[in-house]
Regions:
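Conserved alpha/beta enzyme-core scaffold
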Residues: 1-232
Length: 232
């Protein structure tokens, strides 16, 4: 069964083949369940002109925010970007492009991409700037927008446990966008807290089957949390 073993020994090996100009899908929600070590490896590699698809773009100095420091991202497709001052600066100066997408629509774009569905219709965004330039059709008397699905050259994902074959379990809310991203990457790389022997995972508990996963690596994680400041 050696040919089914998805484990890699280093983060350099995990991201082998990532090149300038590629599209990267990144799991996580805020700072919860983000593939922080894979992001740091992208920074180390110096890969540039990336299109990044994620719920948000991290914070200053952590998560996807570290890729902004050397201007490695040229375009972001996300739902929320308000926590990152460096992102704001680059956006206002025209150094980075942003496509704001409703959160549920973004999730469905990834899910559809992973399922091989090229497009779908949604009522979300009708009558707003989100609808500009998009096909609109009426179903049962209600207008809907056509949204195209999303796939990536790479998907970087954070899991809790995986076996040698790449079957992955996520931990509580750290699941978030991770399984969606995992399904929609041409090359999907998952970093986890623990790798177990084949057969050790309950098949009923597996969230992402190994068929979607190309590489897995075990890492250690800082797991920062976001603090809401209401008064200074």
């Amino acid at each position: 069964m050696a040919g089914f073993d998805k484990r890699v020994a280093s983060y350099e090996e995990a991201l082998a083949g990532l090149e300038d100009g590629m599209t990267v899908l990144a799991g996580g929600f805020g700072l919860c369940g983000i593939p922080e070590n894979l992001i740091n490896e992208i920074k180390r590699k110096g890969t540039r002109d990336l299109t990044v698809v994620s719920n948000n773009c991290g914070v200053d100095g952590f998560g996807l925010g570290v890729l902004l420091e050397e201007k490695q991202i040229s375009k972001v497709i996300a739902s929320y970007v308000g926590e990152n001052a460096l992102f704001e600066k680059q956006l206002l100066s025209g150094e980075i492009e942003v496509v704001l997408t409703p959160q549920g629509t973004l999730a469905e774009k990834m899910r559809a991409g992973g399922a091989g569905i090229p497009a779908f219709f949604t009522a979300t965004g009708v009558g707003t700037p989100v609808a500009e330039g998009k096909e609109t059709r009426e179903f049962n008397g209600r207008p809907y927008l056509m949204e195209e699905s999303i796939t990536g050259d790479f998907a970087i994902v954070k899991g809790w446990k995986a076996d040698h074959f790449g079957n992955v379990i996520y931990r509580h809310t750290a699941q978030n966008f991770n399984p969606l991203a995992a399904s929609a990457g041409k090359i999907t790389v998952v970093e986890v807290e623990e790798i177990v022997e084949p057969g050790a995972l309950d098949p009923a508990q597996i969230h992402t089957p190994g068929i979607y996963v190309d590489r897995i690596i075990c890492g250690t994680f800082e797991k920062r949390i976001e603090q809401r400041t209401v008064r200074k």
